[in-house]
Curated annotation (Swiss-Prot):
It comes from Chlamydia muridarum (strain MoPn / Nigg). This is UPF0159 protein TC_0921. The keyword Lipid biosynthesis does not apply. SUPFAM superfamilies: Thymidylate synthase-complementing protein Thy1. Belongs to the UPF0159 family. It comes from the Bacteria.
Length: 529
């Protein structure tokens, strides 16, 4: 392996120094290389006896692939194209999907609806999304006299155009008008402590006000997202975007493909409309959706849908504690998992509890992760809560979440702080107006009707998660600085699991059950200190 001092000539070392972080250590990083060149380099790496630096020299710096180093723009693009051609051959001819994870791209996706943002964030593995916050950013701005929300072309050319526009404008007007009223009210009931800085108090108060009013924003509200994803992530996401039922989502898919083809073409070319892989994927998705939809309608029509709200544990693994104990001991044993399970079932309960407690007792804070053995016990929940809370919790990825259409049929949530205040009536009026508009539009356009539904309305989703993931989620999302809506969901999930079996309490010991006023005040005070 060419990596030791003296293996490279002085000239080679000079050339390599521009592209690797060191020339001698067996651990180094790449730099100053196009994504497609890095991807092609790593693809060849897995089939070569050479070290990566030697391979970089042979294939790209000294070979024909070195054209990308040229100061001449055309030669540079030619070199990148050669790397891209190789990469495409690997992907198409050998089917090595994993090489699609060897490069990636940052993509800004701006001025898309909050509804579409959820479709984008459905993609779980290989990508990292970041979205404009409804907690720190006011959504009351206008551009050219219009509030910033998505105007779906189907609705805008339908008989419901005026209903849609009037309702969204009414929701935004109510949101804008209530901001100063709620701020003044909170200043009165949550006065500033003399020991707290004005800046920390202001930030916390603003978060509280916007948390309280975000439920008025319709799902059509425009937001911005930033994504980093590897090539495989982008390819899979582009397939799904381009076969979505919503025009907006399909347009996002087309535009995203156009931009990604400019920087990582080899990674996403199989998502181009004319590519046989893409068309086969679209046909598969469409056929599967139609089949499952028909089954859901056929077998669900005789039962009235539940209107129950909140968190309900649907399934808890009856052997979960045995599985956790056995899997936690497995790396340190010579027995099979099956034998360890049998042992755990037969030992006295107090001994089983000792094993379980050992996986939890040494944790000093929520960032101390428990053993992976906790991943062997799983839970499933039905959750019916406001769409705003779903938007926050949906970003957790090491689990399974499936949502139903956003409607007004499951009612809405109103912040406790607004009850019995002058702000309650306008909030409820806005909800009722949105409900009327939704029901009119949904009769003809059930998917497009989602755009007019405010974030305060409830949505139902399935939440399937293992104990380790549940531990992370509940302990994180129950912290006082969180939004009260998802805080309550996290707390209720923890309570449901502990009620299922008290032994799980030791795994959830950093869940915060406290009631808070200005939840972010402590965190902001630390930030300003």
């Amino acid at each position: 392996m060419l990596s030791k001092e003296g293996d490279f000539s002085k000239e080679q070392r000079e050339r390599l120094s521009h592209f690797v972080t060191n020339l001698d250590s067996p651990i180094f990083a790449l730099k100053n290389l196009p994504e497609v060149v890095k991807g092609a380099l790593f693809s060849k790496y897995s089939r070569s006896i050479l070290g990566l630096r030697a391979l970089l020299l042979k294939e790209f710096l000294d070979g024909e692939g070195g054209d990308f180093l040229s100061e001449d723009l055309q030669d540079c693009e030619l070199g990148i194209q050669k790397a891209a051609d190789f990469y495409r051959r690997v992907l198409d001819n050998f089917g090595d999907d994993s090489v699609g994870e060897l490069g990636g791209a940052h993509l800004a996706i701006e001025q898309v609806s909050m509804l579409a943002a959820k479709v984008l964030e459905d993609a779980r593995i290989g990508g990292s999304p970041l979205e404009k916050s409804s907690r720190y950013v006011y959504f009351d701005q206008k551009v050219n006299g219009e509030y910033l929300y998505y105007r779906d072309p189907i609705l805008m050319t339908s008989a419901f155009k005026d209903t849609f526009l009037d309702t969204c404008d009414f929701l935004f007007n109510t949101y804008s008008e209530l901001i100063p009223q709620v701020r003044a009210y909170f200043e009165k009931i949550y006065p500033k402590d003399p020991e707290v800085s004005q800046s920390a108090y202001t930030v916390s108060l603003r978060a509280k006000v916007l948390d309280c009013l975000r439920g008025l924003l319709p799902a059509a509200t425009l937001t911005n997202l930033g994504f980093f994803g590897n090539g495989r992530f982008w390819q899979n996401l582009l397939h799904r975007l381009q076969d979505n039922n919503l025009v907006e989502v399909r347009n996002i898919g087309e535009q995203a493909l156009t931009e990604l083809m400019k920087i990582i073409p080899s990674f996403v070319s199989r998502a181009e409309p004319h590519h046989h892989h893409h068309q086969a994927m679209v046909d598969y998705h469409l056929g599967l959706r139609e089949q499952l939809k028909s089954f859901a309608q056929r077998y669900g029509e005789e039962r009235e849908p539940s209107l129950e709200k909140g968190v309900k544990l649907v399934y808890g693994d009856p052997d979960g504690l045995y599985k956790i104990a056995a899997a936690s001991m497995f790396p340190y044993s010579e027995h099979t998992y099956a034998d360890l399970l049998d042992i755990c079932r037969k030992i006295p309960d107090e001994d089983l509890m000792l094993i379980l407690e050992s996986s939890a007792s040494s944790r000093e804070n929520r960032r101390h992760k428990s053993p992976r053995g906790l991943e062997c016990a799983e839970f499933a929940f039905d959750i019916t809560a406001d769409f705003g809370a779903y938007r926050d919790l949906q970003r957790h990825r090491i689990l399974t979440q499936e949502r139903q259409l956003l409607t007004t049929k499951l009612g809405y949530s109103i912040p406790q702080q607004l009850l019995d205040t002058p702000m309650e009536a306008p909030f409820r009026e806005a909800m009722e107006k949105a409900d009327q508009a939704y029901r009119l539009i949904a009769a003809e356009f059930p998917e497009e009707a989602q755009y007019v539904v405010p974030l305060a309305y409830n949505i139902r989703w399935l939440f399937h998660i293992n104990t380790r993931g549940l531990q992370w989620l509940c302990e994180l999302r129950s912290q006082p600085q969180g939004h009260e809506s998802y805080r309550q969901i996290a707390i209720d999930m923890a309570k449901e699991v502990i009620q299922f079996h008290p032994a799980y309490k030791s795994f959830l010991k950093f869940v915060d059950y406290s009631e808070t006023d200005l939840g972010r005040l402590k965190q902001e005070s630390r930030r300003k200190a």
